[in-house]
UniProtKB/Swiss-Prot annotation:
Keyword Nucleotide-binding: yes
Main location: cytoplasm
Full protein name: NAD kinase
InterPro entries assigned to the protein according to its UniProt record, in alphabetical order: ATP-NAD_kinase_N, ATP-NAD_kinase_PpnK-typ_C, NAD/diacylglycerol_kinase_sf, NADK
Positions of NAD(+) binding: 51-52, 56, 119-120, 130, 149, 160-165, 184
Named cofactor requirement(s): a divalent metal cation
UniProt entry tagged with the keyword NADP: yes
Lineage: Bacteria, Thermotogati, Thermotogota, Thermotogae, Thermotogales
Family matches, as PANTHER family: NAD KINASE
EC number: 2.7.1.23
Matches recorded under SUPFAM superfamilies: NAD kinase/diacylglycerol kinase-like
Family: Belongs to the NAD kinase family.
Pfam family, one: NAD_kinase_C
Organism: Thermotoga petrophila (strain ATCC BAA-488 / DSM 13995 / JCM 10881 / RKU-1)
Amino acid sequence: MKIAILYREEREKEGKFLKEKISKEHEVIEFGEANAPGRVTADLIVVVGGDGTVLKAAKKAADGTPMVGFKAGRLGFLTSYTLDEIDRFLEDLRNWNFREETRWFIQIESELGNHLALNDVTLERDLSGKMVEIEVEVEHHSSMWFFADGVVISTPTGSTAYSLSIGGPIIFPECEVLEISPIAPQFFLTRSVVIPSNFKVVVESQRDINMLVDGVLTGKTKRIEVKKSRRYVRILRPPEYDYVTVIRDKLGYGRRIE
């Protein structure tokens, strides 16, 4: 099997450790930083880092490429193994003993160009700026208006990222939906809405505000169009992986009080 290993820039040592182990059984055809430019074509991409590293690596992957993450960051929703579990991973790889999750991208079109996001796209004001009136038009429906600091449009993958911190729901990865979450809205009852993923969303503000794609500032714009992309990656998990256990252990959600 031809494998690419991509790592966070300060995790080269951990990457070399995995390369040494993996290369005993498979051909490592690429080894480098996840944020380096260029596409990666391999049978499997191994990522060393946290969720941010996985997001960068996913955009370099060809459609449908399986990816597996080794945790070397903080929360690690998109990582599946620890470095200590390398032998366990190799055994799972020999037998292809994985659970697979399909994680799809959203496509964002604006005057800044076309972008892909696995987590979310955010339009928000500068810290020193005033609140902004934002119009959100969902395909086949009339517009919604928010007077807020901004708005986040996220995938199910991104529901445990920025959207969660501003009161959005946790969405299981298998759900085919998009989440629209206003940031610090003026009206308390203005909450997140969840829509079918095949609906296009147009967001327009009264003035130029910051656009962030997967947390990375790309510039300022007034208008974006967001829709589900055809691009996707496959995240490999150990066979016993359970999403509820993950959100309970990492977020404390649904934890039993003793």
